[in-house]
C-alpha cells in the first residue's frame, strides 16, 4: 500500500511517510529544544501550551489508528521517526513498518530500546506494541526532562515496570496520568487500542481548549 492511500483512511488527513533525509525536523530535536527552553531559559521559541502537546499527540494517534485499521503495525514509534514541519508544526510519521521490523531491530537495537514494548523485544508482535511506544512518547511530550540521564533513567524504569509518575503530573493531570499508565503497562493484552486512545485524547483536547478559552 502506498503512503498516499492511507490519507483516505484517516479523518484528520495526516499522511504516513517512510522516513527519508528530506525530513529534517525530528520530534526528538524539537523536544531537546523545548527542554532547553524550560530549564535553561533560552531564547528558543517553541510552543509551551499544554493543549498544543495534546493536539500534536492526537495527530499522532490518528495516524497510528489509520495504519492499524489496515492491519499495518509500525513497530518503531519514537521521536526520531516523528517529524514536524511548518509554522503549525504539522506532524508526520516515518520509520520502518510491518515485516521490515526484524531487519530494523537487528541493525538499530539501541535506537528502539526505550520505546519498544517489553514483549516486542521478545519477538511478540502485535498492534499493542505501538500503544506502549505511544505511551512513552506522550509522557515525553508533556513532561520535560532536565537532563539526558534523567530521561534515560525514567524511561528505563518504565521498561522495568516501575511506574513512578511525577507528582506534578499525577496531581495536576490525573486523567493524563491514567492514560499513560494504561499504555505502558507490561501486560499488553490490557493496553487500550488506538481507537480508544484517540477518543480519550480528543475529549481531553476539548476540555483543555475549553478551559483555555475561559482563562
Curated annotation (Swiss-Prot):
<feature type="domain" description="Protein kinase">
    <location>
        <begin position="1"/>
        <end position="205"/>
    </location>
</feature>
<comment type="subunit">
    <text>Interacts with the kinase domain of host EIF2AK2.</text>
</comment>
<dbReference type="GO" id="GO:0005524">
    <property type="term" value="F:ATP binding"/>
</dbReference>
<keyword id="KW-0945">Host-virus interaction</keyword>
<dbReference type="GO" id="GO:0004674">
    <property type="term" value="F:protein serine/threonine kinase activity"/>
</dbReference>
<dbReference type="GO" id="GO:0006950">
    <property type="term" value="P:response to stress"/>
</dbReference>
<dbReference type="Pfam" id="PF00069">
    <property type="entry name" value="Pkinase"/>
</dbReference>
<dbReference type="InterPro" id="IPR011009">
    <property type="entry name" value="Kinase-like_dom_sf"/>
</dbReference>
<dbReference type="InterPro" id="IPR000719">
    <property type="entry name" value="Prot_kinase_dom"/>
</dbReference>
<keyword id="KW-0547">Nucleotide-binding</keyword>
<keyword id="KW-0723">Serine/threonine-protein kinase</keyword>
<dbReference type="GO" id="GO:0030430">
    <property type="term" value="C:host cell cytoplasm"/>
</dbReference>
<comment type="similarity">
    <text>Belongs to the protein kinase superfamily. Ser/Thr protein kinase family.</text>
</comment>
<keyword id="KW-0808">Transferase</keyword>
<keyword id="KW-0418">Kinase</keyword>
<keyword id="KW-0067">ATP-binding</keyword>
<dbReference type="GO" id="GO:0006417">
    <property type="term" value="P:regulation of translation"/>
</dbReference>
<dbReference type="GO" id="GO:0106310">
    <property type="term" value="F:protein serine kinase activity"/>
</dbReference>
<keyword id="KW-1035">Host cytoplasm</keyword>
<dbReference type="InterPro" id="IPR050339">
    <property type="entry name" value="CC_SR_Kinase"/>
</dbReference>
<protein>
    <recommendedName>
        <fullName>Probable serine/threonine-protein kinase 2</fullName>
        <ecNumber>2.7.11.1</ecNumber>
    </recommendedName>
</protein>
<comment type="function">
    <text>Plays a role in the inhibition of host eIF2alpha/EIF2S1 phosphorylation, thereby increasing viral fitness. In the insect host, targets the endogenous insect heme-regulated inhibitor (HRI)-like eIF2alpha kinase.</text>
</comment>
Amino acid at each position: 500500500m502506498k503512503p498516499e492511500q492511507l490519507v483516505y483512511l484517516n479523518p484528520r488527513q495526516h499522511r504516513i511517510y517512510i522516513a527519508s533525509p528530506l525530513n529534517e525536523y525530528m520530534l526528538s530535536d524539537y523536544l531537546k529544544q523545548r527542554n532547553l527552553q524550560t530549564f535553561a531559559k533560552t531564547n528558543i521559541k517553541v510552543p509551551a501550551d499544554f493543549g498544543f502537546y495534546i493536539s500534536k499527540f492526537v495527530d499522532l494517534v490518528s495516524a497510528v489508528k489509520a495504519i492499524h485499521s489496515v492491519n499495518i503495525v509500525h513497530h518503531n514509534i519514537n521521536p526520531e521517526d516523528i517529524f514536524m514541519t511548518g509554522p503549525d508544526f504539522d506532524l508526520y510519521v516515518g520509520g520502518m513498518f510491518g515485516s521490515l521490523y526484524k531487519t530494523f531491530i537487528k541493525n538499530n537495537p539501541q535506537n528502539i530500546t526505550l520505546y519498544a514494548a517489553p514483549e516486542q523485544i521478545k519477538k511478540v508482535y502485535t498492534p499493542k506494541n505501538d500503544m506502549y511506544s505511544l505511551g512513552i512518547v506522550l509522557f515525553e511530550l508533556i513532561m520535560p526532562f532536565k537532563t539526558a540521564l534523567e530521561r534515560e533513567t525514567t524511561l528505563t524504569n518504565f521498561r522495568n515496570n516501575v511506574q513512578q509518575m511525577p507528582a506534578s503530573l499525577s496531581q495536576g493531570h490525573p486523567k493524563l496520568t491514567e492514560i499513560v499508565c494504561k499504555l505502558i503497562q507490561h501486560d499488553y493484552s490490557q493496553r487500550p487500542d488506538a481507537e480508544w486512545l484517540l477518543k480519550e485524547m480528543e475529549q481531553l483536547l476539548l476540555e483543555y481548549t475549553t478551559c483555555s478559552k475561559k482563562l
